[in-house]
Amino acid sequence: MEVLYNSTRSKGTPVKASEAILKGLSDDGGLFVPDHIPALDKSLKELSEMTYQQVAYEVMKLFLTDFTEEELKTCIERAYDSKFDTDVIAPLVEAEGAYYLELFHGSTIAFKDMALSILPHLMITSARKNHIKNEIVILTATSGDTGKAALAGFANVEGTRIIVFYPKNGVSPIQEKQMVTQKGDNTFVVGIHGNFDDAQTGVKKIFSDKELAKEMDGKGFQFSSANSINIGRLVPQICYYVYSYATLLREGKIADGEKMNVVVPTGNFGNILAAFYAKNMGLPIAKLICASNDNKVLYDFFRTGTYDRNREFMLTSSPSMDILISSNLERLIYRIAGNDADKNRELMAALSGQGKYEISADMKAALADFYGNYANEAETADEIKRLYRSCGYVIDTHTAVASAVYQKYLKETGDSNTKTVIASTASPFKFTRSVMNAIDAKYDAMSDFELVDELSKIANVTVPQAIEEIRTAPVVHDTQCDADKMKDTVKEFLHI
Ligand SMILES: *Cc1c(COP(=O)(O)O)cnc(C)c1O
């Protein structure tokens, strides 16, 4: 059955998957959502016998219904290849009885690679299907990981250009180095004087600037988005939840149909929303455990039913989760409002006006599958140290937030029998200083690359290629701008 995509903010004409991917954001500023969530049409047993690529096809074909089998399989083959340093693409590592789903084996060693290695292929296929002649300009705001993963995905992809905005003082040194050393004539990286929310708001504003869109069209350009507001990012993220269950089943760790919990370190709410969609496709998931850092808007939301961004923005050791406006939550709000675009639009207007909104009791009741909690900086560091001491497994700061929240969940609920998958979203090599300092304060005196070698030793893991590459790479991007000058910067880059 065909899946069409509606905006979360108005009842316009639904669009096909390829059109939603090309546009990124709907014209009314809303996000595209599937008109229904398709059910898995392969049994769990069948899925458990498949490779990652095969599972990805079985999931994505159900959402991207206007892609032919050949188109989709080609995209999948090109995305999930030897760019990943393991054949299984997303390995499951057991530590202390929980299963860490390592989503960081792609070229930029964060989970964003899972979707951004396929998005460029989905995008150019969509452009071809829709007879688009314009060059596609990918505009991206990043809290650190999306930027590099999108740059790596789109670099030198014909018919595309990519512009990445990151908060100049809000990413880790390794994240910044990864971005500013990006090669490719079609890439452009800009540090903004502001935080991630400023970058994201600026990008959304540029997207909804109708005059600019017209001007761009005249010069042969059109915008699209590589942020997780693009449905072409969300759908590929559903696949690894299905694959993790398939792996547990294949390895005899779970019984066919037995439910598992999923813990997700959350920022923009894209990753956990993908898990929610997986559950709605029929994957046996019990609780969706949403883990936040000190920017605990989501924890407060799940507890009180009020989403309130009026608070201090905290810079933490898990920068990819330093977010006060979780964009993808809008897709969940729309759904629990009964797919009511008017209601959702009202709440989003309150969010942009007063910085907060409150959901009804009925809507709150529809969130029963979610459990929210958070870990502060000390708890996050302690969790890295605790897990390393107990079993030698080293996790990054984001994964540590999830792991610490899982410990809180266990304590609160006693639910230790349910098998639990913890999304491990970045390699510890990406946040080496925070990780090593958490393990022992003595490491603070070492340089970034000395720490990399030390981490390799204590974790008994070879240094990933992504880190080796930046040791000596020259800086090729040094543009900075104020948050309110983002549009001018874009125009300069495009020479319009
Ligand atoms: C992006 C990111 C997150 C947050 O994911 P969302 O989909 O934005 O909730 C968590 N951890 C890491 C390492 C990330 O890069």
Regions found by a protein language model. Give the residues of each.
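PLP-dependent amino-acid enzyme catalytic core
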Residues: M1-I496
